[in-house]
Amino acid sequence: MFACQSPAELPEIVLFENGTGDYSCYRIPAILKAPEGSLLAFAEGRTENCGDFGNVDILLRRSEDGGKSWSNTQVIVDFGTLQAGNPAPVVDYFDPEYPQGRIFLFYNTGNVSENDMRLGKGIRDVHYITSEDHGKTWSAPVNISEHVHFNATTSKGHLDWRTHANTPGHALQFKKGSYKGRIYIPANHSAGDPQEGFNEYRAYGFYSDDHGKTWSVSPDIDIPSSNEAIGTELPNGDLMLNIREQNGKTKRRLVALSSDGGATWKETYFDSALITPVCQSSILLFEQKKQSILIYSGPNSTDKREKMTLKFSLDSGKNWVKEKEIHPGGAAYSDLVQVNKEQVGLFYEKDFKQLVYKVFTPKAILSE
């Protein structure tokens, strides 16, 4: 792999900053391009502190000029004094009832901390809301836990699923082939009592072939401690998940591949080129007519959440031919979005105090 160490000299804008507005902390970026071209940047607003549990809302800022300027912050999910988080947005382009496209935002709610959830003391649920006007307004929430997360309140409660988290980051819709139109949300859950090294966690996913009317569940990734996951449809139609390993044993990203839209898994492996601390990362297929580029974003370190780095593959992740360090300091969660035919947006946690949006041009980086 050929490294390019200097930070990219590209436009950057701070969308959320700790201690400003109504929240002490902002985390968990997710970003989406709406059907008419607007960019939607989602985040968690954490009222008291930066902890995962507490009074947490889901926030949105919109840009109608490709990310040059942004709307004021909008609260789109408020679960009272409890937690709403793990935003996973996706556009449904293929529903004939919504020819202009409809946006889904999947999210989780919880009534106790993750530690207590692992002990079976609370309930995590999965919901979605939708927008028919490119993110300006949103529907009432729909709780789909009965179908996609088998906690104690569901008819499959004997499976004893406890924690749950969508992605976080963008979800996906298949755009071609036998599974065209399938909405797929990578996720993870725990099951049963806590195990050493978080080994009760498994990555999985859930999906719909009828625009959210009914839901199916992918089998678990059979790797103990597999955790937060994000996915993409590869040029050959396969589904790829890129997954966090919660116990941190390998310090590498786990990859899972499916040839049937996530109904089964044909291969899992740890990617030796994708080093990582215990943290979330993102992937995106940057689609072009002649050649699609698989892009990865995440902290490029085995020890600390630091060195936000982009990595590029021209063969669906078999080889990573280029990397570009975007920020050498503190860096954690991120998400990627294709802005137009030439540019990609990176929305990431910078220095543990800001959520920053940065534009880059893959061809320019690959030609350096």
Regions found by a protein language model. Name each.
Residues 2-3:
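C-terminal motif of bacterial Sec signal peptides marking the signal peptidase cleavage site
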Residues 6-368:
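Asp-box/BNR beta-propeller blade signature and adjacent active/binding-site loops
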